[in-house]
Amino acid sequence: MSKVSNGGGDSKNTLYCSFCGKSQHEVRKLIAGPTVFICDECVELCMDIIREENKSSMVKSREGVPTPQEIMAVLDDYVIGQKDAKRVLSVAVHNHYKRLAHQSKNSDIELAKSNILLVGPTGCGKTYLAQTLARIIDVPFIMADATTLTEAGYVGEDVENIILKLLQAADYNVERAQRGIVYIDEVDKISRKSDNPSITRDVSGEGVQQALLKIMEGTVASVPPQGGRKHPQQEFLQVDTTNILFICGGAFAGLDRIISARGEKTSIGFGATVKSVDERRIGEVFKELEPEDLLKFGLIPEFVGRLPVIATLEDLDVDALVQILTEPKNALVKQYQRLFDMENVELVFHDDALRAIANKAVERKTGARGLRSIMEKILLDTMFELPTLEGVREVVISGDVVDGSARPLYIYAERQDEKGNVSAGMA
């Protein structure tokens, strides 16, 4: 029968966790089995691993298709806010699975795919949503950067490289690759330089849009086997892109002004109340997005037509950024606490510190993407000193530390009884 130890006892009989090596005095519970021991922290870690595997396998419906609610539930664990965008993605991925599941069945109605465009300011979670989808879906998934693409025949990657990467993600299984999902990031960077047709060749803008049209709509792409270079005598793998779902994302800097200008034209009169762009958050403006605004931005009509589903993301306020710091399963605060835990030190953030970090990210207009760099700067000196310091039990980060007017507070194990309460009060 296994026994549970709550700590205590003399040092000669000290027991240690067989997995992490911590002693019974460093953990809350130590469970004993035949010749092995496991602490409560390792039990929790094992439970997290099991939960992760359950989530990634995902509960399937009777048709073998994950429901939108199931997909969104997993996205909610990792991505804070952006409810509308998550609903759009969940439905689109569900429909993608459903189309593939029913494709072999005889029907007079052919189900067309609906590619997606994600529009949102920098650091609002577009790329992270796609990365999270990659972990939870059961089809090959790749991310491509639109800024590296050029027309075929010019220096740079041509669009068929996207299909090659998808094929590699499917271990060169053509059938699996043809059921995959492609996320194209920074798609706003391939807009043409003006909304008038150009008389000069635009190989990285309009030219790339033209090249993407065929693979997004559905064509048979010739891909060199095992990623080799193309040459005339070579055998090619034929990949049909008809059933590949394309998700495009971009920040579209300046699009908010185009939308607002259109709104001002339609809101003229004594009773009209028009807020300037500065008075409204970018996410609010993006909610009024129409396809004609994308045309003015520089996307060609055919390209916009290939993206019938448009999901807009909101810019993140201070409260949302604080949630991002603490609530997701792999939240930044949890990541740094784990790093400090490896030194047997507890890292504590006061609420005012979290809000100060979020405020800095808002001021810099970097969104969630800027949180890590702010955290790194705050904790750099501490992470440099900590491995050589002895007896540090706890590091406390307050709002003053984030503002630069104070240093992190170190609480030493041997001073806990004498000065522990005083130190905590100072923080």
Curated annotation (Swiss-Prot):
GO BP terms, alphabetized: cell division; proteolysis involved in protein catabolic process
Domain ClpX-type ZB residue range list: 5-58
Cellular component per GO, a single term: HslUV protease complex
SMART domains registered for this protein in UniProt: AAA, ClpB_D2-small, zf-C4_ClpX
Binding site for ATP: 121-128
Top-level lineage group: Bacteria
Pfam families: AAA_2, ClpB_D2-small, zf-C4_ClpX
Keywords: ATP-binding, Chaperone, Metal-binding, Nucleotide-binding, Zinc
List of residues binding Zn(2+): 17, 20, 39, 42
Single GO MF descriptor: ATP binding
Keyword Nucleotidyltransferase assigned: no
Keyword Zinc in record: yes
InterPro entries, per the entry: AAA+_ATPase, ATP-dep_Clp_protease_ClpX, ATPase_AAA_core, Clp_ATPase_C, Clp_protease_ATP-bd_su_ClpX, ClpX_bact, P-loop_NTPase, Znf_CppX_C4
PANTHER family registered for this protein in UniProt: ATP-DEPENDENT CLP PROTEASE ATP-BINDING SUBUNIT CLPX-LIKE, MITOCHONDRIAL, ATP-DEPENDENT CLP PROTEASE ATP-BINDING SUBUNIT CLPX-LIKE, MITOCHONDRIAL-RELATED
Similarity comment: Belongs to the ClpX chaperone family.
Reported function: ATP-dependent specificity component of the Clp protease. It directs the protease to specific substrates. Can perform chaperone functions in the absence of ClpP.
Quaternary data: Component of the ClpX-ClpP complex. Forms a hexameric ring that, in the presence of ATP, binds to fourteen ClpP subunits assembled into a disk-like structure with a central cavity, resembling the structure of eukaryotic proteasomes.
Name assigned to this protein: ATP-dependent Clp protease ATP-binding subunit ClpX
